[in-house]
Regions:
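Mid-to-C-terminal Rossmann-like scaffold of FAD/NAD(P)H-dependent oxidoreductases
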Residues: 4, 8-10, 15-19, 25, ...
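Rossmann-like NAD(P)H-binding beta-loop-alpha module
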Residues: 150-206, 210
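FAD-site-proximal beta/loop scaffold in flavoenzymes
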Residues: 2, 137-162, 240-245, 250-325
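A Rossmann-like FAD-binding core segment of flavoenzymes
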Residues: 42-44, 84, 90-107, 114, ...
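FAD-binding core/adjacent interface of flavoenzyme oxidoreductases
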Residues: 1-21, 76-168, 245-247, 256-260, ...
Length: 423
């Protein structure tokens, strides 16, 4: 199928001295800005970020930093003195308020504006919150560095189960972030309950069989998992800091509640800009949203030519790959731009098990475990769609998984994948 989001008019290359503004100072924005300098762009590069912190890595927030095994400095991508050598101007703690596409201006929350010759939108996503929970003491989300530090500080007020003063933690949502938070809180000695609306966690991503395998990790480690129940309300308790009431009538007392029900693309500042926004900034196959404007990372919804579908991917690898590609395409112009066709890859660390996937399975795909077993929590599972290999999943088999990555990238037959498994 042809790209349904092709530009109405071409995007000329940005000149060597043109000003490029990057809105978003997380991983995709940082990698885009670095790539501009790597490509020897000589004009001003200005990165605007709404958080006050220098660019940092998000995966450790739900693991090492929350656990307390890392300090804050370890999550930053560069030491402060290294940032000064990049030749990039960072304007941090400053939100973009609006975009004037025709005038090529970004309007900022302090009343100032930035003129640009090229714009890279990398504003990422924001954690979804449950209605009515703003301001309820003890209720947290985990998306930003400040979110993590606030949650860790709360957990630091408690001991562990052995001492009898363990925190009672309720995690709402058994997706990858929720599961990682549950595992980390359990590792800190908390008594953890996970609440998931689906009957099988992650069934919409991994299918029922492998979703059930992920659910089993909670049971293996003594973490209570309640599935098939939504949240009816979260309130400040009379005798407990927080009470969580489920749709089945169950009431869960808690000291800490972590809401992990996904994210929404940070596109509110683009309202009225004229860009097409629909669960992200809608882009063509080479990440152009409009002439001289590209998007990257969690906020970009683009046409994946190889998979013949729109994608918006929230994983770390996509941020590291899409940021540089968007930067190169912006410099080259739309006529010389290269389609962005990554093979999706993600990982998650839970209870000492490393879960990795390459490809993009459909829940209806057939799944065959070709190495290890679900019971031992060490396995390779292959996903079949028709006669093709659509994805491969590993539990604590990182080296073996990499052998299947070229097959997934090539759209190999399932028989070829089985042949590799037997070799």
């Amino acid at each position: 199928m042809a790209d349904p989001h092709s530009l109405a008019s071409p995007s000329d290359p940005v000149g060597p001295d043109g000003t490029i503004v990057v809105v978003g100072a997380s991983l995709a924005g940082l990698r885009a800005a670095e790539e501009l300098r790597h490509e020897r762009h000589g004009g001003p590069v200005i990165v605007v970020g709404d958080e006050p912190h220098a660019p940092y890595d998000r995966p450790p927030l739900s693991k090492q930093l929350l656990a307390g095994t890392w300090d804050e400095e370890r999550v930053h991508h560069h030491a402060p003195d290294k940032l000064d050598t990049l030749g990039i101007e960072f304007r941090l703690g400053l939100r973009a308020d609006s975009l004037d596409v025709s005038g090529r201006q970004v309007h900022l929350a302090d009343g100032s504006s930035l003129d640009f010759d090229g714009l890279i939108i990398a504003t990422g996503a924001r954690a979804r919150r449950l209605p009515g929970t703003d301001g309820v003491d003890g209720v947290f989300v985990l998306r930003t560095l400040d979110d993590c530090l606030a949650l860790r500080s709360r957990l630091d007020q408690f001991g562990d189960a052995a001492g009898g003063d363990a925190a009672r933690v309720v995690v709402i949502g058994a997706g990858f972030i929720g599961a990682e938070v549950a595992a980390t809180c359990h590792g800190r000695g908390a008594r953890v309950t996970v609440v998931e609306a689906l009957e099988t966690p992650l069934a919409n991503v991994l299918g029922v069989e492998m979703g059930a395998a992920c659910a089993g990790l909670h049971a293996d480690n003594g973490v209570e998992l309640r599935t098939g129940a939504g949240v009816a309300g979260i309130d400040a308790g009379a005798d407990d800091p927080v009470t969580v009431t489920l749709t089945d009538g169950t009431v869960l007392p808690a000291d800490v509640v972590v809401v992990g029900i996904g994210v929404t693309p940070a596109t509110d500042w683009l309202e009225g800009s004229g860009l097409t926004v629909s669960d992200g900034v809608v882009c063509n196959e080479s990440l152009f949203a409009a002439p001289r404007i590209v998007a990257a990372g969690d906020v970009a919804r683009w046409w994946h030519r190889g998979l013949d579908q729109e994608l918006r991917i929230e994983h770390w690898t996509n941020a590291t790959e899409s940021g540089p590609r968007a930067a190169r395409n912006l410099l080259a112009g739309s006529a010389a731009a290269t389609a962005y066709e990554p093979v999706p890859f993600f990982w998650s660390d839970q209870y000492g098990v490393k879960i990795q996937m390459v490809g993009r399975p459909d829940p209806s795909d057939d799944v065959v475990v070709v190495d290890g077993s679900v019971e031992e929590r060490r396995l390779i599972a292959l996903y079949r769609r028709g006669d093709r290999l659509s994805a491969a999943l590993a539990f604590s088999r990182p080296r073996q998984l990499m052998g299947y990555r070229p097959l997934v990238e090539a759209g190999a037959s399932f028989d070829d994948a089985l042949a590799l498994a037997r070799s």
